[in-house]
């Protein structure tokens, strides 16, 4: 199990931080604005 070998901790930590950072950036710049645009469009359609 590589999680228990201290040599791999830095690699796992770096990979984990990089993956979380990339996912957070993508969700904040691409996914969330599209969802917000869709919800606003639906709200406008329902009101009309």
Swiss-Prot record:
Record flagged with keyword Ubl conjugation: no
Single GO BP term: proton motive force-driven ATP synthesis
UniProt GO cellular component terms: mitochondrial membrane; proton-transporting ATP synthase complex
Residue ranges crossing the lipid bilayer per the database entry: 12-32
InterPro entries documented for this protein: ATP_synth_su8_fun
A Pfam family the protein falls into: Fun_ATP-synt_8
GO molecular function: proton-transporting ATP synthase activity, rotational mechanism
Annotated membrane topology: Single-pass membrane protein
Keywords: ATP synthesis, CF(0), Hydrogen ion transport, Ion transport, Membrane, Mitochondrion, Transmembrane, Transmembrane helix, Transport
Chief place where the protein resides: mitochondrion
Subcellular location: Mitochondrion membrane
Family: Belongs to the ATPase protein 8 family.
Binding partners and assembly: F-type ATPases have 2 components, CF(1) - the catalytic core - and CF(0) - the membrane proton channel.
Stated role: Mitochondrial membrane ATP synthase (F(1)F(0) ATP synthase or Complex V) produces ATP from ADP in the presence of a proton gradient across the membrane which is generated by electron transport complexes of the respiratory chain. F-type ATPases consist of two structural domains, F(1) - containing the extramembraneous catalytic core and F(0) - containing the membrane proton channel, linked together by a central stalk and a peripheral stalk. During catalysis, ATP synthesis in the catalytic domain of F(1) is coupled via a rotary mechanism of the central stalk subunits to proton translocation.
Name used for this protein in its record: ATP synthase protein 8
Organism: Candida albicans (strain SC5314 / ATCC MYA-2876) (Yeast)
Encoding gene, per UniProt annotation: ATP8
């Amino acid at each position: 199990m590589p999680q228990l070998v201290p040599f791999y901790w830095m690699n796992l930590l770096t990979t984990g931080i990089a993956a979380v950072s990339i996912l957070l950036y993508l969700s904040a710049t691409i996914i969330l604005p599209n969802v917000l645009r869709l919800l606003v469009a639906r709200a406008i359609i329902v009101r009309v």
